[in-house]
Amino acid sequence: MLSCEADDPKSFYGGTDLLDIVESAWVSFRDGDYVISLETFQEAKDMADEQGGTDTLLMHATYGNIHTGIGWCNLRLLNADSAKWHFTKSQSYVLYSFGTSVGLMAAYFELGNEIPIDTTQINVAIEIGHWIFSSGMGEEFENDITINVSDVKLLMARSYYAKGNLSNNTDLEIGALYWILQLDPGYVYLNGDPVTWNLYDSGTQDFDSFDEIILMILRALESEVFPA
């Protein structure tokens, strides 16, 4: 038990100083300064490690938050394998966290979305996505509300596209088109006319394949979900 508990009501979280460093790391993350954010999260982890004798559920929450932050920084810096490790570590402290879960899903997707496609990794990403929707957790990440349920739906659509499943299977909630429609129901007319698509309201355009149509839609949706 920390000696500062009597004077610091946040001692069970690791203390005010530690929480301030963690919040500073998230501020840098939200500002897009991922390298600085990663360094600050690592500083927070080092401080938390020095308090190894403190074993409370609230301290576990702080550790989970730190590892989630390190995971997201690595994901933004294109280190998906390291990101996966830290998200998994975070879940060992706090299982039901939207931000951690969608980060882990994204890490598995990035690891699987290579040439050749690693369907094992993609399948895990899909499993996590279905679990997010069935678990009843919130629909946005409290530390960065730009990370929300739309990211999960887009990742589901991209994952099914990577596997070659372009369907709209409403019974099983699978297929790239199914998850596209969860993001934007306006594409529902593709069910009846799958070989044409009105691109940006500029007139009907013909495509060589349904695969090409789905790919173009995914690119358009990415620009909406992840605006520049």
Report the location of each language-model feature.
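Structural signature of alpha-solenoid helical repeat junctions
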Residues: 14-16, 21, 55-64, 69, ...
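Structural motif corresponding to the intra-repeat A-B loop/turn of tetratricopeptide repeats
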Residues: 31, 70, 77, 111-113, ...
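Bacterial Sec-dependent N-terminal signal peptides
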Residues: 2-27
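Hydrophobic/aromatic packing residues within the alpha-helices of TPR/SEL1-like helical repeat arrays
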Residues: 34, 41, 87, 122, ...
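Terminal, low-structured helical/coil segments at or just beyond the last alpha-helical repeat
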Residues: 143-147, 154-158, 162, 166-228
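Single-residue signature of alpha-solenoid repeat helices
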Residues: 37, 83, 117-118, 125, ...
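Flexible helix-coil transition and linker loops at the boundaries of alpha-helical arrays
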Residues: 10-12, 46-63, 92-99, 130-149, ...
